[in-house]
Amino acid sequence: MAAPWASLRLVAPMWNGRIRGIHRLGAAVAPEGNQKKKRTILQFLTNYFYDVEALRDYLLQREMYKVHEKNRSYTWLEKQHGPYGAGAFFILKQGGAVKFRDKEWIRPDKYGHFSQEFWNFCEVPVEAVDAGDCDINYEGLDNLLRLKELQSLSLQRCCHVDDWCLSRLYPLADSLQELSLAGCPRISERGLACLHHLQNLRRLDISDLPAVSNPGLTQILVEEMLPNCEVVGVDWAEGLKSGPEEQPRDTASPVPA
């Protein structure tokens, strides 16, 4: 009967050794599992942020495409209905309003619908355009520059209107008398300097232009540039109360401070 007990005594160390070996193996495997888990999380975060960036780029490109489509040229429509009809249609599609000479204002409703009656006025000059909050950009101005009798133009809060757009307004110099640029975030002093062609302007609104670094001084310069124009929207002393060392610096200027 001693033999079985002896066999057990011989087997026990071997079994215990295997258990210890398994534990040591588990301890060696554990870090690799943690590393794999970390790699999985890192890969997830990489893919996640890549997807977010790709989505952002896609939405940006989609928005740019929509703006481009809204500002396409209506030359084909001009051939059928003339420049007044094509220009009016462009503004109304953008959500703006137009006024033909001796007619009432035509505006779209809250759903973007507007009366087709304006097609009856295609031979009547457009004398006023309210394009406030519209998506007009540099290319879209082609549809307005053909309105040679345009007297009043409002571009308030047009986020795509910039200095380059103002440089294109000179074809309206003979007729344009009122211009509103209030709230346009991309218009600076450089763009306002391009308005020297518009010597028939009688009223110019340049209020709330965040890209203008010194509104008070800018208004003074614009008034000298357009002596027959009433420039409104800026306190002449704004930006002139602080000393020269406190003046905000134009970071886009190539001239060092």
UniProtKB/Swiss-Prot annotation:
Role summary: Required for the assembly of the mitochondrial NADH:ubiquinone oxidoreductase complex (complex I). Involved in the assembly of the distal region of complex I.
GO cellular component: mitochondrion; SCF ubiquitin ligase complex
Subcellular location: Mitochondrion
Subunit and interaction comment: Interacts with incompletely assembled mitochondrial NADH:ubiquinone oxidoreductase complex (complex I).
Modified residues (Phosphoserine): 253
Keyword check for Translocase: no
Main location: mitochondrion
Keywords: Mitochondrion, Phosphoprotein
Gene name tied to this protein: DMAC2
Name of the molecule in the record: Distal membrane-arm assembly complex protein 2
Family, as annotated: Belongs to the ATP synthase subunit s family.
Positions of disulphide bridges: none
The keyword Phosphoprotein is assigned to this record: yes
GO biological process, one term: SCF-dependent proteasomal ubiquitin-dependent protein catabolic process
Superkingdom as given in the UniProt entry: Eukaryota
